[in-house]
Amino acid sequence: MARKIITVFGGSGFIGRHLVRRLAAKGYAVRAAVRDVEAAAHLKPMGDAGQVVAWPADVKNLASVRAAVEGSYAVINLVGILSPWSKQTFDRVHVDGAKNVATVVAALGIKRLIHMSALGASLESESRYAQTKAMGETAVSDACPSATIMRPSVVFGPEDRFFNIFASLTRFSVTLPVIGAPIMPKIELGGEHGISIDFFG
């Protein structure tokens, strides 16, 4: 029996590689849709031979999105940037890219699309990052109303770029300042159950 295919845009990123491993363990065939397939070569051993494939794709290019998505059972879009560079602008990645993925998913009749946005996504925000994340949500909802949109806060786990920075700082300082904050959700990758969602603050 053929494995169901799940395409993961941004599969070589921090969240992506944990998700790819989890999906492969569940028995799915995984297409890790990435701009640099060589940088995603480490994903292949996460499954049986041929189960995990690094697939060349750019969310800004509609044709490459369609090629990556065709035949998929489900699609997950994790693509996002924290700061723009060259042709990778917030608008092109968070809005145009998100719209391209959702448009193709709807056109091909794929029933399941999960889109990763961000906590604080808002058109009223002073941050262009948050503004474009909100614009991307609208584009996804308009193109594919059945899509599931997630708004995670801090995502942490092995090799993350958040808590591990603080861990490295403890090597140079006995104390670290801790700033109070409201309660907010967090997502932890790894552990006994793979992914957990909780609240902290």
Model-derived regions: residue spans:
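Conserved glycine-rich Rossmann-like NAD(P)H-binding loop of the short-chain dehydrogenase/reductase
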Residues: 28-38
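SDR active-site strand-loop-helix element
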Residues: 9, 33, 78-79, 113-119, ...
